[in-house]
Amino acid sequence: MITKLVAVLTCAVWFPLSALAADAPDFTVKKIGEGVYAAISPDSSKAGSNAGFIVGSTGVLVVDTFVDVAPAKELLAEIRKTTDLPIRFVVNTHYHLDHTGGNAVFAEAGATILAHRNVRYWLRSENMKFFPDAKAEQQARVASLVLPDVAYTDAVDIYLGSRLLQVRYMPGHTGGDSVVIVPDANVVFGGDLIWQKHFPNLIDANTADWIKTLEKLQADHSSATFVSGHGDLATPEDVRNFHDYLVTLRDGVARAQAQGKSDQELSASVSALIKEKYTDWGFQQFIPRNIQQTAAELRGEKKVPVAPTPVTGR
């Protein structure tokens, strides 16, 4: 069933789930600090994205849950090889299905799921829009995705015993992005705010916000290890290179628009610029959409999910 679901998702949204291989490992667990682990998925993996987990003295926090329950169960099994401590929290870095599809596995394990407030509102409805032609059973899977139990607005600190984990709202890839910072290990889980040598999905992006977010991450974490949403682990230099890609993309599109180029001319000129500069990046098939989405954004015509009206108390 999930194969059909992923196929629809790939066509409709071009999430990076193409070229799935039945014999490819779903992910590799890498220890990147004391009690800090990244689950890195190859492009051909059925996991669909990267994830990770952090172990403290009183429990475990998981960052993202992959695209479906099967790889999420594999991640749970890997955690159990490392520790028997309870899985207390899951952080969804944003609402996209490739990072939230396994929430149910960890909810059943007793975890509290936390995300930015926009994720709570968008997780089902906005993922559902990617499946307009799906069968009822497939749509039901999206409609039953496990929602976050806790929704925050700007920042929240989580303690696993004495271990501090900082969850911060930093928009760009979507309007509901979170990063998870592990100060004592100098590690930042960036979700899809960071694509390591891969062209990103811009379907919900505000590239102006994204560039500012990446600049703040570089300034605040100049020596950190970054866990990307797609691709391998990233260094501060890698984050800077990804930032520079977004700047190159925006500047190239803006320049072509100012020159009055047609959509076809704009796409051709910017595509040539990008392909020359980023020859070794993955997901080259995303380049045309990156250009189209950025052009729409700069024209003020791009449609992205609308943030819900805040609920005020008395």
PLM region spans:
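Short acidic-hydrophobic surface loop/beta-edge motif
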Residues: 30-32, 54, 156-160, 226-228
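Cleaved targeting-peptide boundary
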Residues: 21-28
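Active-site HxH/HxHxD metal-binding segment of metal-dependent hydrolases
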Residues: 77-157
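Accessory terminal helices/loops
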Residues: 22, 219-221, 233-314
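Conserved beta-strand hairpin/beta-sheet module of binuclear metal-dependent hydrolase folds
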Residues: 30-78, 179-191
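Bacterial N-terminal signal peptides
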Residues: 4-18
